[in-house]
């Protein structure tokens, strides 16, 4: 305790990638950009005659990346001890991409829609059919099954199906290999 591991990880995350403001803990808004942080560290490396580190830091800036910071204790589902870390990482990754991380099978449904180019249209269609935005309805997906199926059929051009969300729940699995 108190050795600075968390502090080191936060510093590295700001060096290795942009940290989106919405992913920073509330009250801890970054006051410097990634570029400013890296240049500060480069100056410190150069003042210690460590040109190799300064060069590596400069090179890091040329690699577009996003860092995702989160408190694993807040995101982990303690009821699933065997896969607690995996599901915490999947949840945070889904949330960072705008999907519903609180419910992994709803997030999988959203990912599938997005990967096939239907997600934005689906959200609009769902709102028209259900009378509420998808961002609100997805947390109650089981209650909106008919509207989800109708919106899905409208945007994909496929016949209307029953219980899409239930099928996602029944078939959802996640392994470390799937996530990687």
Predicted regions and their residues:
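P-loop NTPase motor core
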Residues: 2, 7-141
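Conserved helicase/translocase P-loop NTPase motor core
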Residues: 145-180
């Amino acid at each position: 305790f108190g050795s600075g591991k968390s502090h080191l990880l936060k510093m590295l995350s700001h060096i290795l990638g942009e940290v989106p403001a919405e992913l920073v803990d509330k009250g801890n808004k970054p006051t410097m950009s990634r570029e400013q942080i890296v240049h500060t560290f480069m100056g410190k490396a150069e003042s210690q005659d460590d040109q190799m580190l300064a060069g590596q830091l400069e090179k890091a800036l040329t690699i577009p990346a996003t860092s995702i910071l989160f408190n694993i204790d807040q995101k982990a589902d303690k009821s699933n001890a065997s896969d607690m870390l995996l599901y915490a990482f999947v949840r945070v990754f889904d949330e960072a991409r705008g999907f519903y991380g609180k419910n992994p099978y709803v997030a999988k449904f959203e990912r599938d829609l997005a990967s096939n180019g239907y997600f934005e249209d689906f959200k609009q269609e769902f709102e028209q059919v259900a009378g509420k935005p998808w961002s609100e309805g997805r947390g109650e997906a089981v209650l909106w099954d008919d509207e989800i199926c109708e919106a899905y059929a409208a945007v994909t051009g496929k016949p209307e199906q029953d219980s899409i969300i239930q099928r996602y729940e029944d078939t959802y699995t996640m392994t470390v290999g799937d996530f990687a």
